[in-house]
Amino acid sequence: MENVEFQSIDEVDDISTLDEYQVALDAGLTPDAALKAVNRVSRDNARTPFQWDASANAGFTTGTPWLKVNRNYTKINLESQKDDPDSVYQYYRRLLALRKDPAYAETVVYGDLLPVFEDQDRVMAYYRKSADQTLLVIGNYKTQPQALTLPSKIKHIVLNNLPQLKTD
């Protein structure tokens, strides 16, 4: 699911977002600019009804939801992702399985977290280290590929969401 873009401040329920909207107005922003600013940080993004399927209210309720359903619910929903091996849903299933896998659980759950590539734009990367294992986690937040010089050769890719990943 993606963050919802509220079209009006009247669609917002979060008191903190409402307060920030008022602060933005008091600072001289137009109502449109203030709404755009709070849309990026509103906690209501995580509180919208879960998008189960493409039916009314995304299959969440036959009643009236407390917040509006994201407009993209007919395309982005659990039903549309269940059978797609490249979907976010399937990626998270693999991620949860990795966390439960006895070969990695100790490191994933309890390993030390050591940041790396902190100066690389739009990359979040860190090591998870336990006594006998080190995992390197890299997230690229750009829309295009990035090149990183890795500190050592990758022995094994444990989890990846890209069809092609170059490690040379």
Spans of model-derived segments:
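C-terminal beta-sandwich/jelly-roll accessory domains of carbohydrate-active enzymes
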Residues: 141-168
